[in-house]
From Swiss-Prot:
One of its GO terms (molecular function) is peptidoglycan lytic transglycosylase activity. Transmembrane segments: none annotated. This is Membrane-bound lytic murein transglycosylase F. Residues 270-514 are annotated as: LT domain.
Length: 514
């Protein structure tokens, strides 16, 4: 899979071009008959999106998503409320613009020459490639030359259809595919995972997130190069909304808000490891149930699933784990640390988890208050791994190299330098295995994503099974004699539960959220 690339130079050039085009519309607050004025008069910014872990999702009643958070900030910027409408596929999104039911589309949509003829793009803020996926264990196509419509299905409105058409005309005359008008990209990915479909095409970020919960999903080949992602609005003579978007994105880029949100949703990396992910999910099924209550009991300052992910990174949930340097137990505590925490047995699961949680809380309390709340945990984890003093060195080095010491994105890039003599020789606390601390934090983030998604998926499956049981409750022999059991209906409804359903990070939401 291609490395995700956030090209700020490219974004800057496009933003300048957009600014030149929109210059007559700025300042936009002064106009009365314009899109921004209409939104402010209504008091609501209407945004249409699709349900995905990157764009918009509701988990345990809380809303998440890169596009959701940006849309909420933009609504605040305009001084209005945000109204999110979730659609099934991309075609329905553009229908909302055409029918006047949405002001903006914020759904990880790719900038495309065909789209910009009909719709107004906004600033570009990250990029993806389109990739063809298949299920591990099935035939992997090495080229599009032999792919047929019986194998490849695309969601309606998908930008890749234009690319496929060009490839068919120029390179692969036998290439064919079909479009399923009733399914979105998320559902088609599920179909590939469940063996109902040979291939589909999705963007690289969506695929990497799916793989954290479904390691059996594999990338066969890249269909496109990197493509910038943007929001879309209606294309007409009034550019006030586009001008407002430009001003908004410039402001969050300058104050670091954009980088923090991108780090939150895109910073987990894309170096997917099938074997490691599969082993982790097996441990979730077989080992975690014995430890779950302890993680929940002692995770006071953080989500218990994050504490569990830390423990897996430390010991693979082995209470007897011991390293060559002498650290031991589920949280791999040193003897000195254990003594300072009042622990008597590092291999005791409860003592280790309680001690590790308290030690992490101490690290979080030491993180400077200037660090944003949602990034403090990553600084604390780096300190947990390599020591608080070396984390201070990493911040100091970030300042010396013109970075922001309060930005995890900037600081983590300097961590590997702590093991290089030209850098550590000039730092207060000297040499540190900064590259290990970098990998440590990144691995924990990946395990956390997998754990959250996998557990939510299991909860969904249990809820669906309970509903099925309620629809078809157990009957007495006398009742069975009165009427035959509706096997056909039962099988048709239960077939979807025989394999893994999608993660709740990908669970379809209500059609409209206010």
């Amino acid at each position: 899979m291609k490395k995700l690339k956030i090209n700020y130079l490219f974004i800057g050039i496009l933003t300048l071009l957009l600014a030149a085009a929109l210059w007559p519309s700025i300042p936009w607050f002064g106009k009365t008959e314009n899109h921004v004025a209409a939104i402010q008069a209504r008091g609501v910014l209407r945004v249409s999106t699709i349900d995905s872990p990157l764009t918009y999702a509701v988990v345990n009643g809380k809303k998440y998503g890169l596009d959701y958070e940006l849309a909420q900030q933009f609504a605040n910027y305009l001084g209005v409320k945000l109204k999110i409408t979730v659609r099934q596929n991309i075609s329905q999104l553009f229908d909302d613009l055409d029918n006047g039911n949405a002001d903006l589309l914020a759904a990880g949509l790719v900038y495309d020459s065909a789209r910009v003829k009909k719709y107004q793009p906004g600033p570009m803020y990250y990029s993806v490639s389109q990739q063809l996926v298949y299920r591990v264990g099935q035939y992997r196509p090495r080229s599009l030359a032999t792919v047929t419509e019986n194998q490849l299905t695309i969601a309606p409105g998908h930008v890749v259809v234009n690319d496929l058409q060009r490839l068919k005309e120029t390179k692969f005359p036998d290439l064919s595919w079909k479009v399923d008008d009733k399914k979105g990209s998320t559902t088609l990915l599920e179909d590939v995972i469940n063996g109902k479909l040979d291939y589909t095409i999705a963007d690289s970020v969506a695929i990497s997130l799916f793989q954290r919960v479904h390691p059996e999903l594999a990338v066969a080949l890249d269909v496109t190069d990197e493509q910038p992602v943007t929001w879309f609005s209606r294309l007409d003579d009034d550019n006030t909304l586009s001008a407002a978007l430009l001003d908004f994105f410039n402001s969050i880029n300058e104050d670091g808000s954009l980088a923090r949100i991108e780090e939150k949703y895109l910073g987990h990396g894309d170096d997917f490891d099938y074997v490691d992910t599969r082993s982790f999910l097996r441990a979730v099924d077989n080992v975690l149930p014995e430890l779950e209550a302890l993680f929940k009991k002692y995770a006071k300052e953080i989500d218990w699933r994050l504490l569990a992910a830390i423990s897996y990174q430390e010991s693979h949930w082995d209470p007897q784990a011991t390293s060559p340097t002498g650290v031991r137990g589920l949280m791999m505590l040193t003897k000195n640390t254990a003594q300072s925490l009042g622990l008597t047995d590092r291999t005791d699961a409860e003592q280790s988890i309680s001690g590790g949680a308290r030690y992490l809380e101490d690290m979080m309390a030491k993180v400077p208050e200037t660090v944003p709340e949602d990034e403090r945990i990553w600084f604390a984890l780096a300190a947990y791994n390599m020591g608080y003093a070396h984390m201070l060195d990493a911040r100091a080095l970030t300042v010396k190299t013109k970075g922001n010491p309060d930005s995890w994105t900037d600081v983590k890039q300097r961590l590997p330098l702590l093991s290089q003599k030209p850098y550590y020789s000039k730092l207060t606390y000297g040499y540190a295995r900064g590259h290990e601390a970098y990998a440590y934090v990144e691995n924990i983030r990946k395990y956390q994503i997998s754990l959250v998604g996998y557990l939510q998926e299991k909860e969904k499956q249990e809820a669906e099974a309970m509903k099925l049981a309620q629809d078809y409750p157990a009957a007495s022999p006398e009742e069975l004699n009165k009427a035959p059991f509706p096997f056909i209906s039962f099988l048709s409804q239960s077939s979807g539960y025989l394999t893994h359903s999608p993660s709740l990070l990908f669970t379809p939401q209500k059609k409209e959220e206010k």
